[in-house]
Amino acid sequence: MLFQGILYALLFLLCAVVLAKVRSPGVRQTALLAASYALYVTWGPWFAIVLLASTGMNFLVGEYLRRKPSPAILFVGIVLNLALLFSFKYLPEIAALLPLSPLHRFSHLALPLGISFWTFQAMSYLFDLYRGDDLNPSFVEFALYMVFFPVTISGPICRMPDMLPQFRSQEPTAWNDIGRGLTRIATGVFMVQLAKLLGQGILGGDGISRGFDRVTHWSGPDVWCLALGYGLQLFLDFAGYSHIAIGAAKALGFTVPENFARPFQSTNPSVFWTRWHMSLSFWIRDYVFLPLAMLRRELWWRNLALVIAMVLFGLWHKASLLFLLWGCYHGVLLVLHRQLQQAQRKFDWEPGAMWTPLSWIVTLALINLGWIFFRANSLPQARRMLSAVLAPASYPSHILSGSLYLLVTTLAAGYGIVLLIAEALDRYAVEPQGAEARSGPGFLGQLARWRWFWIPPLYALALIFLLIVTLTRGPSTAQFMYNKF
């Protein structure tokens, strides 16, 4: 949501007070719903009208599905959702390519913020009802599910079976939840600011954005630096946003899905996609890949279903050839990894001690190489960059162009910071038991054993600090890279 501004801070505090003092689920839900729509309307009443129309349509279809789980009703609901998503997200891009067509007047149609996320939430609700889940939300509960302000704009993508019991809870927000939530918010703000510095350039050096937008000739090392740097920048930005969103929800007493779990420590592509943008990855797995894979038992079909799922993953971001190729690239990587696993089992091959570090290096390289499709400004640019990577002559003796010396020196430090953040969050903010459950040895373990680290007065100080940062230097919606998707 919009994390900068007096309105967000005031509504957040108002909701926090209501959830802490009021036990009536109806009052709590109404307060959250009013605050969520008040914030969403700030981007334009038209966006709120579209969201409200989608909410009403999906609630009505859901009522029919709850009474009679019919494939025809499910089909109608999914088609209506996809038609809405297509009209606002993909039709303007198609219309822009057809200047002489009557469709061209739709080329400037504004994209409602978060439409990709709340549309997928609505479809998961319909799928779950069709599968027989016992879900009976009221209209207010369903509307809150669609517009819950911490996660409306860029996720994580929630599911009704997880959220409905929390919406109906009468328990006041626990102090431990407030502490963990503020920890996540502070971490997220820090990560987003790092992403901004990395993208714009640090200490006057060329940043990732300049590298992609201004350089027309790349050496192989230049491309590797840009790819690794962009992967780090995107992670810091999107994971930072996710920490802010998850932290805001947690500080209000709600648990929403995690979105990242140390993805850069993955040792194969399959593990990576269980750790990166997890809420979308699991959505694609549960509602696209598994239903497709179960249609036939042949290996070739399961591999094809995997590629189709990843292509849809790519096109979910944007309807362009680059994102289609990005999805195909990762689909092929996943298929190749499956084939390698089968070969290992067939020949009863036991990997040696060096297998884990080597597989980590290869996985990191392949994943980051794919970001070229994700970030390149055009297909010819992506082709030139990949050609530089694959051409030995593009690796000059000076290793790096001078403008990227400073960038490459920050990458190792950046990845190190990411590992430290993951370790700290793992101990203090993610686990339900908080710091005391993960004390362990070392400096962080000692902090976990110091009880004063978690006393309520520090929560108050942290809240005051976060309000000041949010209102002055905090990230605005326009800063988040993933908002354009």
Residue ranges of model-derived segments:
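Membrane-embedded transmembrane alpha-helical bundles that form the catalytic cores
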Residues: 1-484
